[in-house]
Structures are given as C-alpha cells and as structure tokens.
Amino acid sequence: MSEPIQPTRPAASGCPMHGAQAESWHDAQMDFSKSMSYGDYLALDQILNAQHPRSPDHNEMLFIVQHQTTELWMKLMLHELRAARDCVRNDDLPPAFKMLARVSRIMDQLVQAWNVLATMTPPEYSAMRPHLGQSSGFQSYQYREIEFILGNKNAAMLQPHAHQPEHYAQVKAALETPSLYDEAIRYMARHGFAFDADCIERDWSRPVTYNASVEAAWLEVYRDPTHHWELYELAEKFVDLEDAFRQWRFRHVTTVERVIGFKRGTGGTEGVNYLRKMLDVVLFPELWKLRTDL
C-alpha cells in the first residue's frame, strides 16, 4: 500500500506579520536608498510635520488635521475648476464634464469630513479656542478663490489676504476673471444663443445675478436636450456641483452650531448667523429657476 499523502504545508505568505524574510515579500522592492520611495514622492515628512498645536489640549490635533486636509482637497478643486473653465473657454466641453464631476465628489468627501470634526464637544473646543487667536476658515484664500471662480464675487473679501501679497494677487485675479458660469454663457453666445450685451462683456468682479436672457437660452437647451446635448450635460454638471456645495455649506453650519452654538466666530463674524446667510447664495440662478418654468 502506498504511503498516505501528507498535506502540503502552505508556502510562507511573505507578510512580515508571519515572520517571512523582508526580501521575499512578493518580490517587492525593499531598498530605497537609491530610488524614490512612497514617502519621498508624497513629501510625507513635510506634510506630517506641518501640525503644530498651540495648546496642550489633545483635541487640537483633530482641528488642525481637519482643516489642513480640507485645504488639500480645495487645492484639487481649484486644479479641476480652472481646467474646466479653460475647456469651456476653448470650446471643448466634454473634458470639463469629468472635471466638474470630480469637484462634486470632492465636496461629497468634505461633507462627510464634518462628521469627524463633530466628534469634538463644546468643552473640548472651548479648551483650545483661546489659542486660535483671530485665525478662521473665513480667511482661507483657496476657499475664496473657489467662491470667485464659481461666480460668488465680492471685492471686500480681498482684504483678509492683503497681508500676503502672493495670495492677494491670486484671489484678486480670480475676482477679475470671468467665472466658470460666465465662460459658459460666452460659449453659448459664440454658438448662436442670444443674450443681453452685459452678459457677454461686463465688470467680471461683480457677482452673477439672474438675467432673463440667460434663462431663455438655457430653456432652449432643456427643451431640446438631444439637439444641445453637450450644453445640457454641462448645465446638469453645474447643478450637481451647486447641490454638493450647498450640502457642504449646510454641514458647516450644523457642525459649528453643534460645537460652539451662536458664539461669534474667531475671525469676528456672527458665526452661525453668518454661515446661514451664505446658504441663500445661488451660484447658477437661471438653472434653478428654469425647473419651475419648463
């Protein structure tokens, strides 16, 4: 009779948790003395050493990381929004659809991020608040540029950046440049849609306001989306984006109210009352009104 077959012992997984030699771990490269590593590529030493709490409170690290990661996401939003605006300006709409969809998903990510900050209770925030000075998200130059590129222009909002000339120049350029929505209207004018003259050439530092000729043009698109498919798709991407932006703003309001109530903000604003007023801002008014008028 033949010998019984012995069960085969599984080969070592190579996982460091199972005691395998590092050199054999799935043939992965382990020596980065002469090549770029993950940490090198991402500049992790700089990023992970950029958190400098000013209080002894444990929860300040959460506050700092929350806002730093938000700034990183906003950097990507600006990267996509500027590129999308360039596409529209250059009569090349399809690439802009992906860029705008990505911005909307980033905003979804930021909506969820408020849930993390909401784990900070009022006593925990109060312990670190005296150490914040006058610093406030109100002063974020990237956020201000996002507002401006989306059409919510306000020249008074340049002043918080006057102490940093490079940032001031960047935000001022965004204020004085046609917004993404302005470029969409100019695109439509180049393709045969009729608009009031001041929709095409105006003081670009002024905010977008409702205009009947703009709504009439979008109504034409929405009444025959097949014929105007690219413009229809662009319009819906705008609506998706504003919908996500509204949710981001709303979660900001509710999180602030939950953590600090109706105290004034560290930057001097009315806090929750100021943030609630911002909920009334409409970025693309004609695209919302036409839903009633169709």
UniProtKB/Swiss-Prot annotation:
Pathway: Amino-acid degradation; L-tryptophan degradation via kynurenine pathway; L-kynurenine from L-tryptophan: step 1/2. Its cofactor is heme. Its EC number is 1.13.11.11. Residues 1-20 are annotated as: Disordered. Signal peptide: none annotated. One of its GO terms (molecular function) is tryptophan 2,3-dioxygenase activity. InterPro entries: Trp/Indoleamine_2_3_dOase-like, Trp_2-3-dOase_bac, Trp_2_3_dOase. It catalyses: L-tryptophan + O2 = N-formyl-L-kynurenine. Substrate binds at F63, I64, V65, Q66, H67, Y125, R129, T266. Pfam families: Trp_dioxygenase. It is an enzyme of class 1 (oxidoreductase). Coiled coil: none annotated. Heme-dependent dioxygenase that catalyzes the oxidative cleavage of the L-tryptophan (L-Trp) pyrrole ring and converts L-tryptophan to N-formyl-L-kynurenine. Catalyzes the oxidative cleavage of the indole moiety. Belongs to the tryptophan 2,3-dioxygenase family. Homotetramer. This is Tryptophan 2,3-dioxygenase 1. It comes from Ralstonia nicotianae (strain ATCC BAA-1114 / GMI1000). The gene is kynA1.
